[in-house]
């Protein structure tokens, strides 16, 4: 068993930061990420060579093996020797499918380099671009692997010259993205130069790979590779020996991806926005193993035997069992019970793991992904790492119940665990019907969650057909309305206004947040979104669906005592709007004045909540309310002759073509369609292009539903929720 020998060697190298690399593999779905990971794992001796490529060692969930796609981001530590020196490479495999983006984005936070895998036939696709963009925003340095060269030879029958032209084009496309999205100081430095060995090409399935320096060193020509495939299997096996894939890739990683200390010097200012003069900064910038512990959790797993396993990167200090640590976001102390490193799907115990490494900890039961863990000494002064920007939203929902009603408690527990592991799976209980609602990024996301319920927890469930999650908003400003509490002793005077596009952008990109410095926030809103100085200073709350509550009152007695209750009332009103009980988005709620009863017994939540809600809803219904629907962006590649057919499918689906680009042999269509029209789009595109189209999709934006469909849609949503079809009128919320 190589593995045991390896664990001891791996632990030895962990203490030497120059010999560590933290990398991820990102790509569009099906471009060959997991096959590449397997080859790397087999070379590092974690699974036998015979089954690498078929083993899909990192795809260790049954679901992943069956569907041939990665659902979770898995970790493994690899061992590689370069120029006689041993290196430890922490590898994170990430899903390529758009429905699992949140996992990929969380993985990008803890790595310093990304191997971008591109299929030589399909070229750069939507998810390639999207993940590369996020990687560059996180200051993760890319290198490139152009995969499936065998397809260029066997399927497209390209000549050696044409193969080279295709590779040059892909490198050019990736470099264009780097020049577009990288921070200014890295735009030139990070451009990929094949001559320096920053681009590898090969076949992950056939397990061979080369870089230009290796080609020159081994004296291999493109015509030799074409020749190998004409000679058959034995020649391919020979090529595996002459040009093993792991050698090309891992050499490229060691040479061109920075070690954790080098990377943290330029990544910390980007991902951690604490006080630059805080003494902890010097430890973070140097990844100092003797400094205080600072760890960022990027992944939570529920192990049936061990309980909650929190995996993350140690940015400073050393993680040891028995130590008490502080969770900055959860604001609780926890004791680390066990520390381990990953080897494929297995955790190997360690006495300690030092800065720069990826580690797994048991005992941090209250940790969630995105949590910052710090030594107790800094519990009051540590700023958490920046929140991760998620590109997608969970917009598809199913109602779910166990086939066997006695398993309800088991279902609640299982759903809670699934949400822990994947925070973009959202679980809610419908108070009216008692149903459990599960929301995900797309239908596939939900299907996989249901399969996991069955496979991991033995739960058979019944689900409703998928429904789309909408948002409610307004298009005009309302006048001020009075909301009275049921006992008539408290009154709130409130108006509502739509937030402008610039404010929504600042909120959705996480530039403006509820818990940031109020002066800095006011300055950004004034300068970038044209806010009035007074309003910008007086923000009381910002909720998760991008609504803002502002306090413009002066001298109202007892307001401070009920401030938290008012904020709760605002949040509740925004959670379910008046039109169809869907979440509200993009509304500024202004409190102008209030009358509050002096006796606390008469101003509890049961009085304040309805008063605040009624004033907001009355204003909302007079301000040209509407429903927003989620829109998908499609990126379709297809032979030129099918463009007409594709265009008519898009139009039929209430979509619109944004651009059509002609490429060498194919056309690229960028289009948008509503999520509600997308459930059968895959079959339709296949039918009209004789199966020759390939496409990717991502969440694009929220857009108002066409006016001629609005009332009908509101009635449908309300009926589905067991409400009467007509929405309420403003008068329904105004007390006489």
From Swiss-Prot:
Location relative to the cell: Cytoplasm
A GO cellular component annotation in the UniProt record: ribonucleoprotein complex
Modified residues (Diphthamide): 602
Keywords annotated in UniProt: Cytoplasm, Elongation factor, GTP-binding, Nucleotide-binding, Protein biosynthesis
PROSITE patterns to which the protein is assigned, alphabetical: G_TR_2
Keyword Oxidoreductase found: no
Nucleotide-binding listed as a keyword: yes
Family: Belongs to the TRAFAC class translation factor GTPase superfamily. Classic translation factor GTPase family. EF-G/EF-2 subfamily.
Full protein name: Elongation factor 2
Signal sequence bounds: none
NCBIfam families reported for this sequence: aEF-2 (TIGR00490), small_GTP (TIGR00231)
Listed GO MF terms: GTP binding; GTPase activity; translation elongation factor activity
Biological function: Catalyzes the GTP-dependent ribosomal translocation step during translation elongation. During this step, the ribosome changes from the pre-translocational (PRE) to the post-translocational (POST) state as the newly formed A-site-bound peptidyl-tRNA and P-site-bound deacylated tRNA move to the P and E sites, respectively. Catalyzes the coordinated movement of the two tRNA molecules, the mRNA and conformational changes in the ribosome.
UniProt superkingdom: Archaea
UniProt cross-references to InterPro entries, sorted A to Z: EFG_II, EFG_III/V, EFG_V-like, EFTu-like_2, P-loop_NTPase, Ribosomal_Su5_D2-typ_SF, Ribsml_uS5_D2-typ_fold_subgr, Small_GTP-bd
SUPFAM superfamilies in the record: EF-G C-terminal domain-like, P-loop containing nucleoside triphosphate hydrolases, Ribosomal protein S5 domain 2-like, Translation proteins
Ranges for domain tr-type G: 18-261
Annotated GTP binding sites: 27-34, 93-97, 147-150
């Amino acid at each position: 068993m190589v593995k045991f020998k390896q664990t001891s060697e791996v632990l030895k190298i962990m203490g030497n930061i120059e010999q560590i690399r933290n990398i991820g593999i990102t790509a569009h779905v099906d471009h060959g990420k997991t096959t590449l990971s397997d080859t790397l794992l087999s070379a590092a001796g974690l699974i036998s060579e015979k089954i690498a490529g078929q083993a899909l060692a990192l795809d260790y969930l049954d679901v992943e093996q069956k569907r041939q796609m990665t659902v979770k981001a898995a970790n493994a530590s690899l061992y590689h020797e370069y120029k006689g020196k041993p290196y430890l490479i922490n590898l994170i495999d990430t899903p390529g499918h758009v429905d699992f983006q949140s996992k990929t984005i969380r993985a990008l936070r803890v790595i310093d380099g990304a191997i971008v895998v591109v299929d030589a036939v399909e070229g750069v696709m939507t998810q390639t671009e999207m993940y590369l963009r996020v990687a560059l925003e996180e200051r993760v340095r890319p290198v490139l692997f152009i995969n499936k060269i065998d397809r260029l030879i066997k399927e497209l029958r390209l000549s050696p010259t044409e193969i080279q032209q295709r590779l040059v084009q892909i490198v050019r496309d990736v470099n264009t993205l780097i020049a577009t999205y990288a921070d200014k100081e890295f735009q030139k430095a990070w451009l990929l130069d094949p001559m320096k060995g920053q681009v590898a090409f090969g076949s992950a399935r056939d397990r061979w790979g080369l870089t230009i320096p290796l080609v020159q060193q081994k004296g291999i020509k493109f015509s030799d590779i074409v020749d190998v495939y004409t000679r058959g299997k034995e020649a391919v096996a020979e090529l595996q020996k002459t040009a093993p894939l792991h050698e090309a890739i891992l050499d490229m990683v060691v040479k061109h991806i920075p070690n954790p200390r080098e990377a943290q010097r330029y990544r910390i200012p980007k991902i951690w926005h604490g006080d630059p003069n805080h003494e902890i900064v010097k430890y973070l910038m140097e990844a100092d193993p003797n400094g205080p512990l600072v760890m960022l959790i990027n992944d939570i797993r529920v192990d049936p035997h061990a309980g909650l396993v929190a995996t993350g990167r140690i940015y400073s200090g050393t993680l040891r069992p028995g130590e008490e640590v502080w969770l900055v976001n959860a604001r609780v102390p926890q004791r680390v019970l066990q520390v381990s490193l990953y080897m494929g799907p297995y955790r190997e115990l360690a006495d300690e793991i030092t800065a720069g490494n990826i580690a797994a900890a048991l005992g941090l039961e209250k940790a969630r992904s995105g949590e910052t863990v710090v030594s107790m000494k800094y519990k009051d002064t540590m700023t958490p790492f920046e929140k991760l920007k998620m590109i997608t939203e969970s917009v598809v929902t199913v109602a779910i119940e166990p086939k066997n009603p006695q398993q309800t408690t088991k279902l609640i527990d299982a759903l809670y665990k699934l949400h822990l592991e994947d925070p973009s799976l959202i679980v809610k209980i419908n108070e009216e019907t008692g149903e459990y609602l599960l929301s995900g990024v797309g239908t596939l996301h939900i299907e996989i969650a249901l399969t996991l319920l069955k496979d991991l927890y033995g739960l058979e469930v019944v689900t409703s057909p998928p429904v789309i999650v909408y948002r409610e908003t307004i298009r005009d400003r309302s006048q001020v309305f009075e909301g009275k509490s049921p006992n008539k002793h408290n009154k709130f005077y409130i108006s509502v206004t739509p937030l402008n596009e610039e404010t929504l952008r600042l909120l959705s990109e996480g530039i403006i947040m509820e818990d940031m410095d109020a002066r800095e926030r006011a300055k950004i809103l004034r300068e970038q979104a044209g806010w009035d100085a007074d309003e910008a200073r007086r923000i009381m709350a910002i909720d998760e669906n991008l609504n803002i509550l502002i306090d413009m009152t002066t001298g109202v007695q007892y307001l401070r005592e009920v401030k938290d209750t008012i904020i709760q009332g605002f949040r509740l009103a925004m959670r379910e709007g008046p039109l169809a009980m869907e979440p509200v988005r993009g509304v500024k709620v202004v409190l102008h004045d209030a009358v509050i009863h002096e006796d606390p017994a008469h101003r509890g939540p049961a009085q304040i909540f309805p008063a605040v809600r009624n004033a907001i809803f009355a204003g909302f219904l007079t301000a040209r309310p509407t429903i927003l629907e989620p829109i998908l962006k499609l990126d379709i590649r297809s032979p030129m002759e099918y463009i007409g057919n594709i265009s008519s499918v898009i139009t039929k689906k209430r979509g619109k073509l944004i651009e059509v680009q002609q490429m060498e042999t194919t056309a690229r269509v960028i289009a948008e369609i509503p999520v509600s029209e997308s459930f059968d789009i895959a079959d339709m595109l296949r039918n009209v292009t004789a199966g020759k189209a390939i496409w990717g999709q991502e969440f694009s934006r929220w857009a108002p539903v066409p006016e001629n469909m609005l009332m009908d849609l509101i009635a449908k949503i309300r009926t589905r929720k067991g409400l009467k079809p007509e929405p309420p009128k403003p008068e329904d919320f105004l007390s006489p």
